[in-house]
């Protein structure tokens, strides 16, 4: 796309991936442009790109305009389409007013959909002409919507899938605080920070902002709209009403020729031009308003200036992703979310989609399938196809989620109103909806509603896997699952022929089980495509038998169905059984029966098991060859003449390099074992038994290898530690572990002792939160909509607020209750005791784990509240939530609010311990009510939770993987080129705001950091923070890691005070989502300590080292090498703080531990001994070493893999080599900016550095939690 200030592409050359990839081998070094896009727009070249070289078809053209400034320059690429150039023009500040126009070259109109390379004679410095077009009604409506957004007259749209503050980013507010800190000479941001202090909920709330300059009072449709028939004949399209800042009201006619002021008043209709005092008209509404309002131009410039102060990413609209909805939002009474009057809000649907809404009705299924059939031969074809696919999935997911919410609320009429509620089906916006419940008894033998609910969730995962494989000739319907108010709703695009009445004797399904497993259909046309699918998913071709015992050979599970659509396409449906059942789980006796028989293995596990078996095969093959080689050598030595030594070495080398042929290896699992199939012959029974053994081996692999390895990795600190329920779930899923194993993992974690207390706490909390979710969903399913908040508040009080009120009563409006005589109000009967019993039962049944006797007394209330809110889609209004009677304010509580905004300095400290602060004012007192932790008014909103089947871009991932491989092979330039290409592809295909793009920003920022391009690293890390906040949440675990990365890069760039602000924010977030003393916070505290040393704040630095030591001792014990490493660092810090006595004491402790753990000859021990002697002998050596210490500590921190974000791609559970993406952990973790210093340091003959690096290798396996420290102390 053409470069504009409205688009965030890194360098113009990236717009032509076909050229770039083909030239990758010979291309020159390309650096990412970390500057704002405006600087690359309008004729400016990104570094490394020369226009005369026309690299990637890049050149500059001029555009002649009908109005000021009459001519602009635009950088374009020969690969992009004319419509991309149009978009560039629309986004440039000097050409904002144009929306309805076409482009001409040499007097001929250029088609919008051709590439620039196809325009005859168009070359560098050519001039194209912008010609204004007559408006149509649709163009006029779009123009009005666009102008309202530009001049800031558009208020917030009320949206049923985007909640309050959707897509919020706090980065700008934090950055402003950092900028103020950097500019001032005052104390740094950590000077009075309480490391073990309580969390403040203000951390995750938007900061109050200065209102933007107002350009007009309103732009709305006039009451005279729409135009009567006889005036439509004369070109009248719309009638508008504009009120300027001066208070004047103008009636405006939107005409095919443009906009003009008419003679209408509120009482008189005369839509013809007003000529007195003079005729006012313009092609653009923006130009017309500037003629009518004297203050408009200055206020519009002020608005643009104010918008330019913000990072463009924070205001960029979402295109290919659904924004994150924060769980905590400002209270409705606060000024931040005050509801403003805006008459046009109710008119926007008409402006966007016309009178009958027909413009937004799409044939989703046909769009999906025609997109899938697009050519994919060239790179350019693939870019276009994947870009379209990504946009289509995003549009469908949004439309389907909206419809699902309406279905859940009962606002869509069912197609079969006489059926039971769970069996009803709906069609809305060309999307077919049904409930994720067993309305027709399909899953009666599998567990009924529970099984159906799980099946539709697994179906989406299966469809996502098939979409990712992108098999030619196999089609899937667009599918989405939405959880909302206790209901699970499935939305699917309508497959042609799915509702068709078949002839007698014909099956509704063409391949697979028909209505269960009693009838099985086969069709020769499905065999080739299902064969490809099964091969990719490791599914074994196997026989199944129908109710008459007849054998049918199927490529997939009997549950997976093939349907030949009336459009001639082959569709695959019901993909919830693409992996086998977890046989061991089913057979394992729990105290209660598991709720369903849909407990299947994860695809990640099957892939992991396949790699494991292949590895065994390769080892066996290598061993077989070695034995054969030795036997052959023995024969040769007896018979043949002796070879020359060199020739023998060469032949051996050739044999070593020979690759093992894995074509003889195959592993495929039968998904239908243990599912009621009855083999008929002895041979079939034998084969079936073999299939069952393979599945059992896979289950055993999960239990005996995957789960123990994960627990051990977390115990040893080999991987990033999860912070909350979401990051824990991601970690388990990545390893192929199902959530039902939370209980087993908790038992294994407990057995490991105190070091994994943090993991045990997280696992138990996740089980409780999920049990509560199931219970709440059961209550919510039939609760009338106005009582949802009452139900949720009451259940939360029973779980979290029993100490404040042991017998909470649901707040229900009795007069409103009478309106719903058939509503289900059973939630009222819930008590703290009954809810605890229900949770214990759910945990026992679902996770086969017994909670401790008084588990409810050790809850982490705020963290559990957050987890539950995220799982149920609740948005809570912020205030001081009180969960303990001791923290209640002493004054009488009005309206059950518990003193929100209560300003008692004595109780404030106590209150903050549990909940945090709030800037919302106290609500007006109405009457005294019993104290409650959560009141109905706290439940501001409930948002739908969406599970989609959108595939990732294979092209962008291929470019990224090629870049990584090149870097691993030390082809730095090519690797950078390919990774930049991948970034361009990510941005083109996904759009800017997407979690996948955020991950890539992380990785790329790390790459630039390692290559000493610090500014680019900081810029990309900043983008990673904003995109992560907006797509994953302002307090997600990924956001914390993004801020920590950014802090390191800022520090490396010399902005240490800024870095400390980001660390402070990350620590504050940590307190909210996990609480204090997270295992990974040790490294962060060390970072902070080193940065403070850099600022010569030795006293504060020492406090952070001491805090790090406390956490380390609690996790690893007093006598661990990790603790010794921190003691060593702390002793140095004390020396810098002139505390020689303390320094000697800590260094002695470190020496004793090293001596005990590593022995007297280890270099760690020797170095500690040397330091100890020097510190003890005299204070002179302290002064002598002071400068060395500071410099060396800085190097240490930069060598810390974990600190530098070895998890640059922010996934908890990633190991160091994985995240580095280029080299092994020890290499990637080096701070490239100090590589030269390091070399000088080592060459200078200082033994301490060398000795410690060797120790690190010895100690890493057993104590990698502080690998950074070990390196540094190494």
Curated annotation (Swiss-Prot):
PROSITE patterns: CLU (PS51823), TPR (PS50005). SUPFAM superfamilies: Hypothetical protein c14orf129, hspc210 (SSF103107), TPR-like (SSF48452). Residues 1200-1217 have a biased composition (Polar residues). InterPro entries: CLU-central, CLU_dom, CLU_N, CLU_prot, GSKIP_dom_sf, TPR-like_helical_dom_sf, TPR_rpt. mRNA-binding protein involved in proper cytoplasmic distribution of mitochondria. Belongs to the CLU family. This is Clustered mitochondria protein homolog. The lineage of its organism: Eukaryota, Fungi, Dikarya, Ascomycota, Pezizomycotina. The gene is clu1.
């Amino acid at each position: 796309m053409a470069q504009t200030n409205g688009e965030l592409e890194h360098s113009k050359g990236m717009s032509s991936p076909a050229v770039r990839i083909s030239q990758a081998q010979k291309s020159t070094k390309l650096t990412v442009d970390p500057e704002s896009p405006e600087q690359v727009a309008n004729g400016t070249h990104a570094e490394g790109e020369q226009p005369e070289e026309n690299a990637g078809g890049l050149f500059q053209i001029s555009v002649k305009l009908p109005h000021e400034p009459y001519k602009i320059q635009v950088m374009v690429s020969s690969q992009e389409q004319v419509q991309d150039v149009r978009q560039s023009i629309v986004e440039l500040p000097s050409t904002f007013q144009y929306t309805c126009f076409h482009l001409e070259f040499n007097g001929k109109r250029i088609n919008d959909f051709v590439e620039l390379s196809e325009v005859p004679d168009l070359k560098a410095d050519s001039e194209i002409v912008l010609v204004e077009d007559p408006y149509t009604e649709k163009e006029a409506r779009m123009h009005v919507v666009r102008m309202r957004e530009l001049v800031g007259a558009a208020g917030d749209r009320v949206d049923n899938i985007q909640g309050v503050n959707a897509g919020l980013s706090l980065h700008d507010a934090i950055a402003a605080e950092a900028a103020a800190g950097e500019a001032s000479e005052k104390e740094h941001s950590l000077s009075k920070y309480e490391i073990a202090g309580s969390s403040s909920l203000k951390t995750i709330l938007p900061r109050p902002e200065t209102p933007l300059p107002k350009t007009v009072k309103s732009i709305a449709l006039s009451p005279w709209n729409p135009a009567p028939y006889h005036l439509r004949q004369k070109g009248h399209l719309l009638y508008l009403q504009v009120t300027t800042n001066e208070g004047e009201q103008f009636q405006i006619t939107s005409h095919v020729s443009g906009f003009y002021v008419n003679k209408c008043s509120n009482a008189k209709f005369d839509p013809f031009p007003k000529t007195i005092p003079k005729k006012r008209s313009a092609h653009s509404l923006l130009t017309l308003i500037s003629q009518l309002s004297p203050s408009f131009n200055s206020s519009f410039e002020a608005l643009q200036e104010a918008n330019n102060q913000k990072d463009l990413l924070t205001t960029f609209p979402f295109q290919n992703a659904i924004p994150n909805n924060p769980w905590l939002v400002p209270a409705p009474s606060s000024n931040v979310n005050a509801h403003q009057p805006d008459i046009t809000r109710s008119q926007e649907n008409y402006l966007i989609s016309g009178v009958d809404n027909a413009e937004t009705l799409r044939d989703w299924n046909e769009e999906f399938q025609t997109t899938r059939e697009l050519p994919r031969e060239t790179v350019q074809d693939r870019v276009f196809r994947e870009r379209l696919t990504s946009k289509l999935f995003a549009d469908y997911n949004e439309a389907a989620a909206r419809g699902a919410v309406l279905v859940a609320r009962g606002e869509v009429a069912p197609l079969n109103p006489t059926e039971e509620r769970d069996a009803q089906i709906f069609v809305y916006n060309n999307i077919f909806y049904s409930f994720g419940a067993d309305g027709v008894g399909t899953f009666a033998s599998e567990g009924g509603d529970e099984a159906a609910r799980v099946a539709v969730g697994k179906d989406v995962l299966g469809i996502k896997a098939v979409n990712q494989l992108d098999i030619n000739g196999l089609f899937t319907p667009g599918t989405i699952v939405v959880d909302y108010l206790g209901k699970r709703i499935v939305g699917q695009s309508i497959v042609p022929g799915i509702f068709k009445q078949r002839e007698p004797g014909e099956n509704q399904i063409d391949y697979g089980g028909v209505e269960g497993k009693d009838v099985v259909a086969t069709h020769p046309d499905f065999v080739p495509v299902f064969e490809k699918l099964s091969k990719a998913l490791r599914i074994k071709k196997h026989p199944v038998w129908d109710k008459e015992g007849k054998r049918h050979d199927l490529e997939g599970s009997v549950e997976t169905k093939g349907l030949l659509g009336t459009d001639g396409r082959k569709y695959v449906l019901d993909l919830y059984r693409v992996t086998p059942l977890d046989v061991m789980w089913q057979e394992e006796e729990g105290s209660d029966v598991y709720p369903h028989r849909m407990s299947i293995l994860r695809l990640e596990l099957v892939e992991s098991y396949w790699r494991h078996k292949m590895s065994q095969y390769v080892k066996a093959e290598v061993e077989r060859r070695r034995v054969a080689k030795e036997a052959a050598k023995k024969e040769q030595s007896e018979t043949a003449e002796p070879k020359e030594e060199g020739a023998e070495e060469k032949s051996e080398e050739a044999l070593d390099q020979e690759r093992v042929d894995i074509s003889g290896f195959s592993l495929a699992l039968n998904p239908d074992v243990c599912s009621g199939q009855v083999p008929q012959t002895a041979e079939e029974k034998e084969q079936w038994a073999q299939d069952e053994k393979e599945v059992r081996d896979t289950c055993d692999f999960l239990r005996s290898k995957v789960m123990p390895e994960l627990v051990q990795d977390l115990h040893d600190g080999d991987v990033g530690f999860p912070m909350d329920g979401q990051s824990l779930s991601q970690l388990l899923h990545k390893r192929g572990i199902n959530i039902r194993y939370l209980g087993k993992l908790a038992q294994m974690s407990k057995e490991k002792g105190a070091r994994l207390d943090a993991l045990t706490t997280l696992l138990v909390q996740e089980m409780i939160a999920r049990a509560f979710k199931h219970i709440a969903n059961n209550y919510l399913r039939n609760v009338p909509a106005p009582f949802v908040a009452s139900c949720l508040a009451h259940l939360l009080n029973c779980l979290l607020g029993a100490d404040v009120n042991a017998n909470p009563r649901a707040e229900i409006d009795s007069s409103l209750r009478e309106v719903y005589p058939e509503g289900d109000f059973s939630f009222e009967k819930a008590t703290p005791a009954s809810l605890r019993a229900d949770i214990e039962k759910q945990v026992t049944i679902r996770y086969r784990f017994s909670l401790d006797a008084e588990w409810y007394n050790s809850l982490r209330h705020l963290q559990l509240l957050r987890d539950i809110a995220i799982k149920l889609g609740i948005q809570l209004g912020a205030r001081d939530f009180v969960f303990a009677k001791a923290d209640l304010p002493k004054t009488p509580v009005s309206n059950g609010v518990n003193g929100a905004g209560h300003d008692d300095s004595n109780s404030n400290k106590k209150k903050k311990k549990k909940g945090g602060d709030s800037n919302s004012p106290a609500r007006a007192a109405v009457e005294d009510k019993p104290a409650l932790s959560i009141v109905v008014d706290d439940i501001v909103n409930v948002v739908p939770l969406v599970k989609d089947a959108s595939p990732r871009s294979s092209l962008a991932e291929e470019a990224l993987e090629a870049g990584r491989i090149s870097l691993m092979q030390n082809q730095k330039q090519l690797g950078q080129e390919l990774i930049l290409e991948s970034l361009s592809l990510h941005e083109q295909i996904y759009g800017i705001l997407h979690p996948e793009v955020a991950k890539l920003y992380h990785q790329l920022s790390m790459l630039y950091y390692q290559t000493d391009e610090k500014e680019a690293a900081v810029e990309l890390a900043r983008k990673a923070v904003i995109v992560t906040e907006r797509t994953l949440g302002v307090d997600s675990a990924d956001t914390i890691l993004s801020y920590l990365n950014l802090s390191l890069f800022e520090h490396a760039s010399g902005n240490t005070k800024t870095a400390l602000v980001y660390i402070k924010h990350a620590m504050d977030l940590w307190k909210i989502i996990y609480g204090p003393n997270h295992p990974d916070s040790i490294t962060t505290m060390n970072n902070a300590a080193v940065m403070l040393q850099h600022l010569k704040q030795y006293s504060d630095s020492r406090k952070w080292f001491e805090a790090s030591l406390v956490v380390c001792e609690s996790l690893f014990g007093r006598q661990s090498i990790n603790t010794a490493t921190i003691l060593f660092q702390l002793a140095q810090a004390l020396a810098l703080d002139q505390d020689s006595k303390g320094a000697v004491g800590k260094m002695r402790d470190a020496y004793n531990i090293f001596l005990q753990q590593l022995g007297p000859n280890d270099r760690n021990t020797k170095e500690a001994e040397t330091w100890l002697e020097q510190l003890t002998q005299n204070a002179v050596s302290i002064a002598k070493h002071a400068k060395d210490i500071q410099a060396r500590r800085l190097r240490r921190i930069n060598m810390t893999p974990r600190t530098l974000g070895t998890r640059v791609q922010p996934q908890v559970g990633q190991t160091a080599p994985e995240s580095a993406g280029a080299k092994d952990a020890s290499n990637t973790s080096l701070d490239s900016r100090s590589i030269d210093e390091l070399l000088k340091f080592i060459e200078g003959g200082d033994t301490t550095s060398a000795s410690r690096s060797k120790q690190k290798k010895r100690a890493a396996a057993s104590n990698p939690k502080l690998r950074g420290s070990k390196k540094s102390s190494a």
